[in-house]
Amino acid sequence: MAPPSITKTATQQDVISTVDIGNSPLLSISLDQSRNFLVNGHPFLTQVPPNITTTTTSTPSPFLDFKSNKDTIANNNNTLQQQGCFVGFNTTEAKSHHVVPLGKLKGIKFTSIFRFKVWWTTHWVGTNGHELQHETQILILDKNISLGRPYVLLLPILENSFRTSLQPGLNDYVDMSVESGSTHVTGSTFKACLYLHLSNDPYRLVKEAVKVIQTKLGTFKTLEEKTPPSIIEKFGWCTWDAFYLKVHPKGVWEGVKALTDGGCPPGFVIIDDGWQSISHDDDDPVTERDGMNRTSAGEQMPCRLIKYEENYKFREYENGDNGGKKGLVGFVRDLKEEFRSVESVYVWHALCGYWGGVRPKVCGMPEAKVVVPKLSPGVKMTMEDLAVDKIVENGVGLVPPNLAQEMFDGIHSHLESAGIDGVKVDVIHLLELLSEEYGGRVELAKAYYKALTSSVNKHFKGNGVIASMEHCNDFFLLGTEAISLGRVGDDFWCCDPSGDPNGTYWLQGCHMVHCAYNSLWMGNFIHPDWDMFQSTHPCAEFHAASRAISGGPVYVSDCVGNHNFKLLKSFVLPDGSILRCQHYALPTRDCLFEDPLHNGKTMLKIWNLNKYAGVLGLFNCQGGGWCPETRRNKSASEFSHAVTCYASPEDIEWCNGKTPMDIKGVDVFAVYFFKEKKLSLMKCSDRLEVSLEPFSFELMTVSPLKVFSKRLIQFAPIGLVNMLNSGGAVQSLEFDDSASLVKIGVRGCGELSVFASEKPVCCKIDGVSVEFDYEDKMVRVQILWPGSSTLSLVEFLF
């Protein structure tokens, strides 16, 4: 018979789900007579209310090969057993918003992602239910090896027109907040508003669960099913911090020229907010200049879009050539022709057209109605935000969902005709605040994301989008059918907008933690984008190091002519490309359940993989972050001091990347420290103590050691040690054991370093013998730029 579901009449321990993973212990979820959720017989949520129900997943796991046992059902030799289950509840009253206790969480370490702003999430840890934050999007309970308890994931999802998040309840209860976003949309019975999943691997845990949810909902595609836009391989420049709303064609041109002249030509350019035609409701929509003169912080929020065409600053562009085109189309064409490195130009727009939406009753624009945003109880618990205050005060000109396609087509068709390659779609999670009269948040989101997806497929090759201000499960579960690149952290704040002078430093640690931990969840849907930074900021190198190994695009928002070219050249190649990792960076296991911002002892450690080596980044981010009492980010200077951690080759998830690396049989790794410029040989289980001052870093290239069987020569490529992601330069690697020959395909230029236990007889680059240095078992050879990103073939003969 089928595995039993939990109901309010359950009188014995019901096994909901079991899974056998190879030689690993059998994993099972059950509910005992005392109403406790158990994993392998050990409670993780206790005193579960009688109205909580569960159902098993209906399809075999796409990941695991299960073995039959007494709790499973065989069907044509395939079991229907799963390592997870869906959770629901019954109530007697149909409402638009339910807060439902799920069970008590006590004494188990957890890591979570919660919304601290309407549109941004971050990391939070604790051990008891009352320590949870409102608007929690994902909750992972730590495993206990001695008890045999695996990692447990609690993932709030969507059911019909309702969306779920987690929050703290009374007496350490974990509560589910299940809401429709409209008082007209009510419900009383839910079968699958939350998903529980088990795994002994925290990275597979989330990936597997997302696959199950995808099968259940059918409303999104995972990242591995999509192709991110080509800008992820490039260095870029964004106009935001350089100009804010005062961006203009001459400034964009001068910005690209300054970077190009300095040897760091951008491969893509983002023209941020400030190019559109907008106005306040009391401005004359014909002149439009009044709206464009509102450039102080917050002044643009009440403005609304009044035409698809660019504003007068870009519309009046002309290059002086009688035969040249004017306006945005002429500017983009001239920019790409003059600066050949620029392959893509993106522009910014809000999901609703502009911050204040679309202005009603404007000729040439779709119908729009000013809607007063309504904040849910969970959103009211987020951080105070000037943008939200201004938008609530002035309302949003919402284009009805049946006309969203017309709006996106209008914006995007004009941009496509002007030579624009993609869009940064911002202010995405404003939509949930506008859903009262439009069928609720889920239905309104479905309509808008369907229209956006259709337009992107039509005008921008299906993937020419950067999603921003999108941090909520509505977006990830409904809006990622085509979108494959998105921001995973709050904005880069060069200083604290609240005026704390120390924010110049501690906010940078916050940003890094946002991006690293959010990627654990978001990276299953979109390729993580760690946002821009400025190369002259006091923490610029700190930022650059994290971006270089993030696996995503790397771009800056430098003011025109104000650049640190020495730093830029540590991650930008002369053709505007970058040395990108194969995967996206994630926190290491030993800091998943720790607080790298304000416990004074935890180092943020992130791992990634290149083709032939791993990379481990160590960052001291301690010094400030979310404060539950004041419900805002604030300084915690008492924790801003030197931090010590242990680093090991084991910290790298060799089998969890996009292209897993087989290290079976590898006994020793050559580990190169970028800042210390030293190399150590380490066994996989070796641990090295590293201490870092506040807002400083170290990058470790971890390269498996190869041994020539003929002469027992040890060899490991490090890469270009002048580049932050040194190992990313090694693009091909071939060992000829019989000839004692190594061939390395190197991308980029600078100093190539390799470890070799013996001095090579000779070294050749593209068939020509070259000089090299050999000291302390390190071979160093200079690689010249070949004129493009084609590989230089470097040969070492022993």
Swiss-Prot record:
Optimum pH is 7.0. The keyword NADP does not apply. The lineage of its organism: Eukaryota, Viridiplantae, Streptophyta, Embryophyta, Tracheophyta. GO terms for molecular function: galactinol-sucrose galactosyltransferase activity. Pfam families: Raffinose_syn. InterPro entries: Aldolase_TIM, Glycoside_hydrolase_SF, Glycosyl_hydrolases_36. The keyword Lipoprotein does not apply. Inhibited by 1-deoxygalactonojirimycin. Not inhibited by stachyose. Strong inhibition of the hydrolytic activity by sucrose. Keywords: Carbohydrate metabolism, Glycosyltransferase, Transferase. Belongs to the glycosyl hydrolases 36 family. PANTHER family: GALACTINOL--SUCROSE GALACTOSYLTRANSFERASE (PTHR31268:SF37), PTHR31268. Transglycosidase operating by a ping-pong reaction mechanism. Involved in the synthesis of raffinose, a major soluble carbohydrate in seeds, roots and tubers. Able to utilize D-ononitol and D-pinitol as acceptors. May also act as a glycoside hydrolase. This is Galactinol--sucrose galactosyltransferase. It catalyses: alpha-D-galactosyl-(1->3)-1D-myo-inositol + sucrose = raffinose + myo-inositol. Its EC number is 2.4.1.82.
